[in-house]
Amino acid sequence: MAERVLATLETGRFAPHGPPRKPSYRVVAWNLERGIEYEGQLEAFRTHPYLRSGDLYLVTETDVGMARSGNRNIARDLARNLGLDYAFAPCYLNLSKGAGVESEASGENEIGLHGNAILSRYPIRNARPIPIGNGRDKMRGREKRLGQQVAVAADIGLPGLDLTVCSVHLDAQSKQNHRRDQMQAILDGLPAAGPAVIGGDWNTTTFDSSSATAAIIGYWVRVMLGPGNTIRKHFLRPYTYFERKLFRLLESRGFNWRDANLLDERTTSYDVEDAKTHKNLREWVPAWCFDFIRWALREFDGKCPLKIDWFAVRGATPAAPVVIHEFREGRKPPLSDHDAIGIDLRPDGRSQI
């Protein structure tokens, strides 16, 4: 039964028919952190000048029937309220309410699904899941789950641009090589040629996070490299060394990521004084580590920026990449632990239909 549920794609149509042809199409990717702050996220999609002008939304970490997110169907509820078509691919059937502060959510899970989605103003065709495997046994630890990470891909009939899109969340609890292998599985599941965009949370932290021990060893390696040097040359530029295989793989398949992203710009941050982050990490990182983390980040106000959300584009011209910090930074509570990212896509001569 669980396997059948996890293999079932959910789709719905709420968009008006016949949206117009445009000189460029706006794509937004945002990790919604389960949809815990759904009401604020919906308001942002409705009213923020950039978000409300999107044509395609690649949303990751969306719940269905989880207590932590009000037992909503996050992707469907967003699509209905925003007048969009949607496709949702479940990744996990959760056997608990979550980890860290999520375990304290009131009520119980009514369904317990979690996954990734595509929302679109234009018709979604041939939506399909792309299983990409786990980097760690999800039955270990407090948040016990059945299933595996799954990307969701679809063909979108944009006027003037026949585009394949893929909403991606690479496994946070994984090695660098496993993230590269997950991206290869995604690329193997997409057409070998033609216009395409891959977007989402790639978790390019530079760390081997498959275990607490590996993460702690990696932390000390980065301390020896120097915190400032590590932040500038690795955390904000993961493609330079630790995650280079993933980015080179994309280039070998004809995908352009350099022009599709605002380089050197953070999309999330670790704040050593954030109580929620501290509680979540405390479940698998020993308490003594936090004093050393504070020491390493003492010159950076206890904050460590990371660039882990990305686009890669093939067969279309990327333009004007953005990172929107205001939903996360300086907002209590933040709408998500990730920034939204965006890009405009212009058809090139080969992509006309």
Show where each model-derived region lies:
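Active-site beta-strand/loop signature of hydrolases that rely on acidic residues for catalysis
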Residues: 26-32, 45-71, 91, 119, ...
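Metal-dependent phosphoester-hydrolase catalytic domains
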Residues: 1-13, 129, 190-197, 204-353
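Short aromatic-enriched loop/helix-cap "lid" or pocket-rim segments at secondary-structure transitions
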Residues: 40-42, 70-72, 98-102, 131, ...
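N-terminal, active-site-proximal structural segment of metallo-dependent hydrolase catalytic domains
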Residues: 1-113, 346-353
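Active-site environment of divalent metal-dependent phosphoester hydrolases
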Residues: 35-37, 64-67, 94-97, 137, ...
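Surface-exposed cleft-lining segments at the edges of enzyme active sites
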Residues: 62-63, 133-143, 168-176, 233-234
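Beta-strand-turn-beta hairpins that frame and shape the catalytic cleft
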Residues: 14-27, 112, 116, 120-126, ...
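Soluble or luminal CAZymes and related metallo-dependent hydrolases
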Residues: 37-40, 70, 111, 145-148, ...
